[in-house]
Amino acid sequence: MLQPKRTKFRKMHKGRNTGLAHRGSTVAFGQFGLKSVGRGRMTARQIEAARRTITRKVKRGGKIWIRVFPDKPITNKPLEVRMGKGKGPVEYWVCEIKPGKMLYEIEGVSEELAREAFTLAAAKLPFKTTIVKRTIM
C-alpha cells in the first residue's frame, strides 16, 4: 500500500477540502485519463484496488500512471476510550481529491478497452469521475 517513507510531522489537522484542482488536472503522460468530478478522500486501499482493476482489465498491454499519492495521515482512537488524552494513532493514509484532479492515466491500449478499465475502476472510488482523452495541441 502507498504511504510516505517519512514525514516532518506524524499527525495532521482535519482541514477542509475546498476549491478546484488546478495542478494535475490534464492528461500529461498517457492517452486517456480518469478524472475526478466530485470531491472526497481517496484512501491508499482504494488507490490500490482501482489500480489492480485497471491492470487486470488491460492484462499485459498498456502502461498505467497513478497521479495521486496518499500523503495525509488519518488518526482514530480505539473503541470504548473516553474523550481527551490526546489524538489517536495513525490508522491509514488518504489523498484529498478536488474536482478536476487526474487520478489515473493509461496509454498503449484502445479507447474502448481504456473506457472499460476506467469504468470498472471508477466503481471502486467514493466520488464521481469522468474519462478524458488527451488533446493534441
From Swiss-Prot:
Kindly state a single biological-process term from the GO annotations of this entry: translation
Q: Out of the domains of life, which is the source?
A: Bacteria
Give one Pfam family, short name only.
Ribosomal_L16
Provide the alphabetized UniProt keywords. Answer: Ribonucleoprotein, Ribosomal protein, RNA-binding, rRNA-binding, tRNA-binding
List, alphabetically, the GO terms of the cellular component aspect.
cytosolic large ribosomal subunit
Q: What does this protein do?
A: Binds 23S rRNA and is also seen to make contacts with the A and possibly P site tRNAs.
Assembly behavior: Part of the 50S ribosomal subunit.
The entry's family comment says:
Belongs to the universal ribosomal protein uL16 family.
What's this protein's name?
Answer: Large ribosomal subunit protein uL16
